[in-house]
Amino acid sequence: MRKLPRQARHRVLEITLDMSSTMHAIARECFPNAEQVIDRFHVQKLACDALQELRIEHRWEAINEETNEMENARLEGRKYRARKFRNGETRKEILFRSRLLLFKDPAAWNVKQRKRASVLFELYPDIQKAFALVQRLRRIYSSCKSVAGARLKLALWYNQVNEAGFHSFNSVAASVFAHWNRILNFSTTGVPTLPPSLLTPSSRP
């Protein structure tokens, strides 16, 4: 950064970065006149990761439950058959195959994903609630055009996260609180929203 002329660095008025304290310090030192904007990708990814963590917790519960049922069936000398729900999948399969649909906007779901999501949300209302929180955050980024409007909606979202009481969302709420002003700066910039597909990791349980 210091290889850039000092005068040129001082002309930079805006810089987009992640939530790293190191990057914050570097940006402040190298671009003292630039307004810092937290890249919305990092905020949205925190929320998506928290949602997936909740799904994974339930998946392990389903795996353990199925393992116990299989063992009981073996001890009783009967054949084990896992219950299949109306979309033709077992509880464990639903939780495993729901990974990608939870990264998407519901409008982008195909028929099979819509059926799977319907069953998933009936079985796990907490996943449905967490999914709604992620979607609300995306709408804040896509709809707010002023700091005042963004502040109001983000504050409401922050309160909803706290009221939901999801352990996996604690780090999301803490990060939003810690970087509040720099997150709100997104509403004064023209940086485009990254599509949900870019939030999908290449591999995840």
In which residue ranges do the predicted regions lie?
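Acidic/histidine-rich catalytic cores and adjacent linkers
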Residues: 2-32, 45, 64-205
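Short, surface-exposed linear patches
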Residues: 36-40, 58-61, 69
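Inter-helix linker motif
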Residues: 33-49
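Short, surface-exposed amphipathic charged segments that create phosphate/polyanion-binding patches used
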Residues: 48-59
